[in-house]
Amino acid sequence: MTFEDDLQASVRTIPDYPKPGVMFRDITTLLGDARAFRRAVDQLVHPWAGSKIDKVAGIEARGFILGGAVAHQVSAGFVPIRKKGKLPHQTVRMAYALEYGTDEMEMHVDAIARGERVILVDDLIATGGTAEGAVKLLRQIGADVVAACFIIDLPDLGGAAKLRAMDVPVRTLMAFEGH
């Protein structure tokens, strides 16, 4: 069994959630398995071992869990990227595309200094709308987005390709065809 097969076995798939026809990939089972969680975090950060990374930005909500662990591994600070209205201090905001409409995300305006090297982290990349918005938000405040990391890629939906087209290297640990 390969690393990817082993990791995929730790992800629960729930058919027809949140709506009919969707195969929901639930990483809470991976997070609850200490060995799988550790291996996933180690593999996410492997390309940057020994590199200077200043901050890890995690997208709400599962990106907070993974981002905190990744930040610890690379000895970097952690920055939450949240839905609009959830942060108490002055923020910078970016609109992003959803399947049906738009939403906004934000981060504290002073969370990242211009030129800091940042890795963006979330659990899954599908269409890439949220991750694209996060990259734009980070670049708006002057961050150098070194990479975007995800446990799961749904390649048929094109999100990873969208980020690569923005000159952001993308690291994923497993792919599920279809959605």
UniProtKB/Swiss-Prot annotation:
Cytoplasm in keyword set: yes
PROSITE patterns per the UniProt record, alphabetical: PUR_PYR_PR_TRANSFER
Highest rank taxon of the organism: Bacteria
Keyword Transferase carried by entry: yes
UniProt keywords, alphabetically: Cytoplasm, Glycosyltransferase, Purine salvage, Transferase
Catalytic reactions of this protein: AMP + diphosphate = 5-phospho-alpha-D-ribose 1-diphosphate + adenine
UniProt subcellular location: Cytoplasm
Coiled-coil segments on the chain, per record: none
GO terms under cellular component: cytoplasm
GO MF entries: adenine binding; adenine phosphoribosyltransferase activity; AMP binding
Primary location: cytoplasm
Pathway terms, separated by semicolons: Purine metabolism; AMP biosynthesis via salvage pathway; AMP from adenine: step 1/1
GO biological process per UniProt: adenine salvage; AMP salvage; purine ribonucleoside salvage
Assembly: Homodimer.
Family the entry assigns: Belongs to the purine/pyrimidine phosphoribosyltransferase family.
Matches recorded under HAMAP family: Aden_phosphoribosyltr
Role: Catalyzes a salvage reaction resulting in the formation of AMP, that is energically less costly than de novo synthesis.
Protein name per the record: Adenine phosphoribosyltransferase
Upper lineage: Bacteria, Pseudomonadati, Pseudomonadota, Alphaproteobacteria, Hyphomicrobiales
Gene: apt
